[in-house]
Amino acid sequence: MRCVTSFVVFCILMFFVLNIFTVEVKAQRLVPLCKTIGYENPGKCPADGNKFCRRKLDDRYVKYKRCDCQDTKGRKQNHHRCICYMKLPCNQ
């Protein structure tokens, strides 16, 4: 019983000690989004893949500097994925 009481008292003291020393943490600035990755679509990239991706992901609020079309293979079928960059260089 003596050990249990000592343990409870120790835990309460540690709780108070840890709450006395508060540390202020500055909020980190959010890194602006640089890259947008589209969904996987069936079929291969067309001949004008970059322009195709730009048309597909283009938005009136966001202007992309560059878009790439990448061919991928999944479940024995061809797919393509569009990746567009809002600013260059995109260091993430």
UniProtKB/Swiss-Prot annotation:
Residues 1-27 form the signal peptide. It is found in: Secreted. Keywords: Antimicrobial, Disulfide bond, Fungicide, Plant defense, Secreted, Signal. Disulfide bonds join C34-C90, C45-C69, C53-C82, C67-C84. GO terms for cellular component: extracellular region. The keyword Signal applies. GO terms for biological process: defense response to fungus; killing of cells of another organism; signal transduction. PANTHER family: DEFENSIN-LIKE PROTEIN 241-RELATED, DEFENSIN-LIKE PROTEIN 245-RELATED. Belongs to the DEFL family. This is Putative defensin-like protein 251. The lineage of its organism: Eukaryota, Viridiplantae, Streptophyta, Embryophyta, Tracheophyta. The gene is SCRL12.
